[in-house]
């Protein structure tokens, strides 16, 4: 019987620099999904790679004193090294500088032009270099890029345009009739309400102001727009050919089952990409999932903030599987997750060293101590055994259900619930007490057999998330990996088998203080400059009115108005270490709000967030800038701030009561 096919891809990583753990999360997430699909019996094709063209790369290479190709060769190699370090099982690592990709992009552009979907004109408007995106004046938010909040520069040049509006109605109909196409649901609502329903403008798809890119075949002074180049990797990487000579691999795997991407590029993948495919008369991918961000403790990671955590640094401290476990376990389905060194140590010690590692070590040690390593099922059972078996046999079903919905963090929680149940079983049966009673030896053997069997099932389920740990556990138990079908039965471990007589520690406990001291040496904190202290004092003059407030009555409290606001633009307040100035959409209004959160959030990461706002405060000036409200945050004992955000998707302007 032929296997069902499953094609999964990540967004290709932009080669502007070394990827941090937030970037790395996406490929680890895709790898976990791909591995589990293989466990389910699918014929899986997993593609990732690097996006290597564009003006930003050209500028970076110039700064580095190398050619663009030399620059991307180096960065792409580093990205691939980290993907391999994280033990990702991709089938294809595509580069947009691959010759076969470049040739197909030229053909695709030419085909769209011949079809009348691309036409030549003149572009005059605004361009965001970091986003490689064009905007009209009306699309800018407070004069800044609506996507990243950074300044745009005027651009005036001859260009080719794609007729986006030609396919807009067709795309809207497709989204409405394919409810799973854009996930999570909140991303779909954002695309429909903010972009498609208001109407699409034609998209500029070529540039003449830089040279690092794929030239338009019939007009080589034009360079193909980087997103048209990058998005087509999903089909060129599996052998698509414009001339009708597509490979067997393309015919086998397209359309893709899942494009896994960051939530910040959902528009390109759910509007531009589907329309490009419609132009090529190709079927659309079955699902685009915009995953949340993995944030450092004080906000989105960025080199400018100095809060970047790199995957290879984490691996050096914790090991590959511990890092994989953390990023997969700590990321909710829809909301952003947080990573800190403290949390990493806490998770390793509690979940990996204690719950999992201690369970495996205790079970093997008791098997050696009481039965010379022989694990034999004597079938001397009690009701507690049936409870254990029923619990364990339900876990694979729960994991499959969670993974089918891409709820990876929930799936890992299910696996660890199995290990926790086994630990509880040890407390319930007390093997050490049974060992003291000569008449209970067969009962003791049965208990240890049940533990080994349960661990084998749990370890096999763990393979998609922590593959090397699975292998290490099964080797020590002298056991084979179970298939999901095998996991429908309890008792497949060969009775009379012998476990290792030298159990290894899976995860050694770490001392938080020692880890933080090493991190400090790795990333020493910069001393505060005198002028920064002086500046803080100057800022204090503007906010001196903020003091501890007296008790108020309920009537006083009811005077306050709280609403949900959506930050549509944000910029740093010049000459200020603390302040950000945000443009906040509240219902049909846009308010300007100044907040002292610059040390905790960058201006870029604020854009797009839904926050809680006090909307009826009397306007006041902070650092000379008018502020028309207050964005609410929580503060811990160490002075760390966290934005107060709605738990569920709520519209801007919703009242908080």
Locate predicted features.
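Beta-strand segments within the central parallel beta-sheet cores of soluble alpha/beta enzyme folds
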Residues: 287-290, 474-476, 581
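Structured secondary-structure scaffolds
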Residues: 1-48, 100-104, 154-369, 411-415
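Cys/His-rich short segments
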Residues: 115-168, 172
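Phosphate-backbone binding interfaces of nucleic-acid-interacting proteins
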Residues: 535-657
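A glycine-rich helix N-cap at a beta->alpha junction
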Residues: 76-91
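N-terminal catalytic cores of NTP/NDP-binding nucleotidyl/phosphoryl-transfer enzymes
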Residues: 2-75, 94-109, 114, 131, ...
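Intrinsic disorder at enzyme termini
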Residues: 470-556
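Helix-rich, typically C-terminal accessory recognition domains appended to large enzymatic cores
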Residues: 120, 343-380, 391-499, 614
């Amino acid at each position: 019987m032929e296997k069902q096919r499953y094609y999964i891809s990540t967004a290709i990583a932009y080669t502007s620099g070394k990827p941090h753990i937030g970037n790395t999360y996406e490929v680890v997430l895709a790898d976990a999904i791909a591995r589990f699909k293989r466990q389910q019996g699918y014929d899986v094709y997993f593609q990732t790679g690097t996006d290597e063209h564009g003006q930003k790369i050209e500028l970076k290479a110039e700064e580095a004193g190398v050619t663009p190709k030399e620059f991307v060769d180096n960065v792409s190699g580093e990205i691939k090294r980290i993907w391999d370090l994280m033990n990702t099982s991709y089938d294809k690592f595509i580069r947009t500088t691959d010759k076969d990709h470049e040739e197909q992009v030229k053909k695709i552009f030419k085909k769209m032009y011949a079809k009348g979907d691309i036409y030549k004109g003149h572009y005059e408007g605004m361009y965001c270099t970091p986003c490689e995106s064009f905007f009209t004046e009306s699309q800018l938010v407070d004069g800044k890029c609506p996507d990243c909040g950074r300044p745009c520069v005027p651009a005036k040049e001859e260009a080719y345009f794609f007729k986006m509006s030609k396919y807009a109605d067709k795309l809207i109909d497709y989204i409405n009739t394919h409810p799973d196409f854009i996930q999570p649901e909140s991303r779909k609502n954002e695309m429909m309400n903010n972009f498609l329903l208001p109407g699409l403008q034609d998209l500029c798809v070529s540039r003449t102001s830089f040279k690092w890119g794929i030239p338009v075949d019939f007009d080589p002074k034009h360079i193909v727009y980087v997103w048209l180049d990058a998005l087509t990797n999903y089909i060129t990487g599996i052998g698509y050919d414009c001339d009708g000579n597509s490979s067997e691999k393309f015919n086998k795997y397209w359309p893709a089952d899942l494009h896994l991407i960051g939530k910040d590029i959902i528009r390109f993948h759910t509007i531009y990409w589907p329309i490009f495919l419609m132009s090529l008369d190709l079927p659309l991918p079955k699902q685009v999932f915009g995953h949340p961000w993995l944030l450092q403790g004080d906000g989105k990671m960025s080199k400018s903030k100095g809060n970047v955590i790199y995957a290879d640094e984490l691996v050096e401290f914790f090991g590959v599987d511990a890092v994989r476990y953390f990023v997969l376990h700590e990321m909710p389905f829809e909301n952003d997750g947080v990573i800190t060194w403290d949390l990493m140590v806490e998770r390793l010690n509690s979940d990996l060293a204690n719950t999992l590692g201690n369970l495996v070590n205790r079970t093997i040690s008791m098997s050696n101590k009481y039965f010379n390593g022989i694990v034999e099922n004597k079938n001397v059972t009690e009701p507690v055994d049936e409870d254990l078996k029923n619990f364990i046999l339900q876990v694979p079903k729960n994991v499959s259900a969670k993974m089918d919905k891409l709820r990876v963090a929930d799936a890992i929680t299910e696996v660890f619930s199995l290990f926790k149940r086994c630990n509880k079983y040890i407390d319930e049966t007390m093997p050490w007490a049974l060992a003291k009673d000569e008449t209970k030896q067969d009962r003791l053997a049965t208990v240890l057999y049940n533990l080994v069997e349960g661990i084998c099932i749990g370890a096999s389920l763990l393979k998609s998330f922590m593959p090397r740990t699975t292998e290490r556990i099964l080797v020590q138990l002298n056991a084979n990996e179970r298939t999901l079908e095998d996991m429908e039965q309890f008792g497949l471990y060969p009775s009379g088998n012998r476990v290792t007589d030298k159990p290894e520690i899976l995860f050694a406990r770490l001392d938080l203080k020692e880890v933080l001291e090493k991190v400090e040496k790795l990333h020493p904190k910069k001393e505060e400059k005198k002028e920064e202290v002086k500046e803080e004092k100057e800022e204090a003059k503007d906010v001196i009115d903020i003091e501890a407030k007296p008790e108020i009555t309920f009537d006083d409290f009811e005077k306050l108005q709280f609403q949900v606001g959506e930050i549509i633009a944000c910029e740093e307040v010049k000459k200020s270490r603390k302040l950000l100035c945000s443009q906040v959409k509240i219902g049909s209004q846009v308010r300007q709000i100044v907040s002292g959160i610059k040390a905790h959030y960058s201006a870029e990461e604020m854009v797009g967030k839904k926050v809680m706002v006090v909307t009826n405060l009397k306007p006041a000036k902070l650092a000379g800038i008018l502020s028309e409200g207050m964005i609410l945050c929580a503060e811990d004992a160490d002075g760390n701030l966290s934005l107060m955000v709605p738990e569920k998707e709520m519209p801007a302007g919703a009242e908080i009561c």
